[in-house]
Amino acid sequence: MSKFDDFDLDVVKVSKQDSKITPQWKSESLCTPGCVTGALQTCFLQTLTCNCKISK
């Protein structure tokens, strides 16, 4: 592994006692208020555009 010393992947070893996996990023919705699970609740377009109005 000495060939890969120039890469810092921010990997941390944990013991088996502390092996609970927790996400570092949590969110109720991607960016649209009122759409709790984002794209899964049929508001994919609003989630995709962050509830912005697009006009000519």
Curated annotation (Swiss-Prot):
There is a cross-link at residues 32-35, 37-43, 47-50, 49-52 (Beta-methyllanthionine (Thr-Cys)). Changing residue 29 to A: Devoid of antimicrobial activity; keeps full lysis capacity. The modification N2-succinyltryptophan is found at residue 25. One of its GO terms (cellular component) is extracellular region. The keyword Ribosomal protein does not apply. The modification 2,3-didehydroalanine (Ser) is found at residues 29, 55. The keyword Nucleotide-binding does not apply. It comes from the Bacteria. Belongs to the type A lantibiotic family. Lanthionine-containing peptide antibiotic (lantibiotic) active on Gram-positive bacteria. The bactericidal activity of lantibiotics is based on depolarization of energized bacterial cytoplasmic membranes, initiated by the formation of aqueous transmembrane pores. This is Lantibiotic subtilin. It comes from Bacillus subtilis.
